[in-house]
């Protein structure tokens, strides 16, 4: 009898991923990225955490079509005068959903370079469920350096997931 396949879930901080990749000078193709996660890491479900902006409805539909399970966070306008910046910090949602889903997966991939996920990553490692931390670039939080053996930069497989 063959070994049973592990159930792998990815938990993606979309803003951290998108802005981190843009800071490296390229744009991510989310559909290619989803296919890469399935092919490389056997990701069964990819949860994409994103701030909800009504005018981006078609983007959300295309992400669903690409195979993401979208978890929305309500957004608020930034406090800086005249910035017009919209904020939708998804950290709490990502941690909460990774714990809600905890009994359903054998391994997790956290996609973010944000140090706010330190306690989640530490817990997943302790429970032998941390597979990878995929960071958008090399400027990830120093808090995550303790988990260096799990860290992979998106830049290493950029050619497979970039737009265009």
Segments (PLM) and residue ranges:
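Domain-level signal for Mg2+-assisted phosphodiester chemistry and nucleotide/NA-binding surfaces
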Residues: 1-90, 130, 138-139
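Nuclease catalytic cores that cleave nucleic-acid phosphodiester bonds
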Residues: 54-164
């Amino acid at each position: 009898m063959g070994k049973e396949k592990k159930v792998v879930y990815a938990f993606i901080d979309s803003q951290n991923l998108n802005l981190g990749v843009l800071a490296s000078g390229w744009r991510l193709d989310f559909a290619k990225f989803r296919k890469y996660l399935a092919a490389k890491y056997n990701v069964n479900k990819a949860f994409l955490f994103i701030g909800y902006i009504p005018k981006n409805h078609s983007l959300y539909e295309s992400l669903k079509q690409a195979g993401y399970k979208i978890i929305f966070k309500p957004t608020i306008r930034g406090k800086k005068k005249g910035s017009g910046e919209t904020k939708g910090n998804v950290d709490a949602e990502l941690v909460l959903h990774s714990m809600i889903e905890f009994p359903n997966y054998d391994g997790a991939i956290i996609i973010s370079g944000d140090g706010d996920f330190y306690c989640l990553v530490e817990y997943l490692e302790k429970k032998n469920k941390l597979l990878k931390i995929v960071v958008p670039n090399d400027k990830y939080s120093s808090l995550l350096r303790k988990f260096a053996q799990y860290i992979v930069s998106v830049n290493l497989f950029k050619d497979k997931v970039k737009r265009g």
